[in-house]
Amino acid sequence: MRAGYITEYERAVLIDEIGGHVTAAHSFWLFSHENPDGDSLGCALATYAALRAIGRDVKVLTTEPVARMYRFLPHHDKITHTTVLPPGLPDVIIVNDTGNFHRLGSTYEDQLTARGVGPNAKPKEPRCTLINLDHHVGNELFGDINLVDPSCAACGELFYHLLRQLKLPFTVDVAINIYAAILTDTGRFSYANTNKETFRIASDLISLGVDPYEVVDRVYNTRTPAQIKLLAKILDTMTIDGDQYYFYCQVTQEMLRVTGTVMSDTEGVVDTLKTVENFDVCFLLKEEGDGRVRVSARSNDRFDCNTFARRFGGGGHPAASGFTMRATLGDAPHLLSDALRQYRQEIARKRQPMQEPQR
């Protein structure tokens, strides 16, 4: 079963249900997807700030360090970077901006499943409630409570409604994190999913003390020389397939080594690639060094990244998605090309008109 659109009333009912658990619970673990972006980090940190303000015990857990561009976010230093979860379980686990449980990454998925949490856990641990908060169409509804609202341009919008309705403390720290979440997931309010509600929420956050210039400047206009050198190396790998109207760039472990950077320093690079004209889709292939290649995809309105990413167990939005390939960086482009060709052929067949039956 996958998520579809819900009404404002249905959203309000689910938020009230979540509120009951927030009131009753003392301990919380907050998770984002692998390689957390601005939306997922902003939501987790806003929730951390709000729950700590009412005296709850809260942990934000990630396997990767926070990307440099997000290290100005309030409470980013409270994030626990670990591959081993703390012992036991909290009263509530909140997973945000994550279309399926696998997107937590096998490191966390396996540990939680073994402790009785998640869709594949047998038996389930009844004393821990798993809350799934997301805005992606096709979310696999893996939680005990699933609040998924695809009408929200960013997960940050959903968390804005959640925190407002539950009347949790909405400090300036909360507001900055929510604003950064919305800003980054709407491409600086430029993507097609941006609407008047997005701007209304942004306006309210500014009234609470957010400096929009500072947030934009810290996220998009603060790069180190090493990051620029890395970007130059990435762009030098640009490979074009004119027949299929796509191109890709690569990030190797060697590039990271010689420039003194880490993979999180590639955050935002794929959005730069999207600005190249006359292509339906572009990909950034990132060598993880463990037999996997992580792929970020961006497209125009002629190509559905989300549907394509699902072929590899990933997902996201029609114009921006991600997935992981079990392959070497040398093999990944060929697998990608073959999958694209097959995908386009399937789409073409679906668009062919039905033939009249012969009489």
Q: What is each of the regions a protein language model found here?
A:
Residues 38-44, 101-105:
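Short glycine/serine/threonine-rich phosphate/pyrophosphate-binding segments
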Residues 35-36, 98-101, 136-138, 253-254, ...:
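Short glycine-rich anion-binding loops that position phosphate/pyrophosphate groups of nucleotides
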Residues 2-34, 42-71, 81, 86-90, ...:
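Hydrophobic helix-and-loop "lid/oligomerization" segment in the mid-to-C-terminal part
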Residues 78-83, 147-150:
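Short acidic-hydrophobic, aromatic-tinged amphipathic segments that line or gate anion-handling sites
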Residues 71-73, 105-106:
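Metal-dependent catalytic neighborhoods of phosphoester/phosphodiester hydrolases
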Residues 61, 92-94, 129-133, 145-148, ...:
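Hydrophobic/aromatic beta-strand patches that form the interior of the parallel beta-sheet core
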Residues 82-144:
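Active-site cofactor/cluster-binding pocket
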Residues 133-201:
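Short alpha-helices
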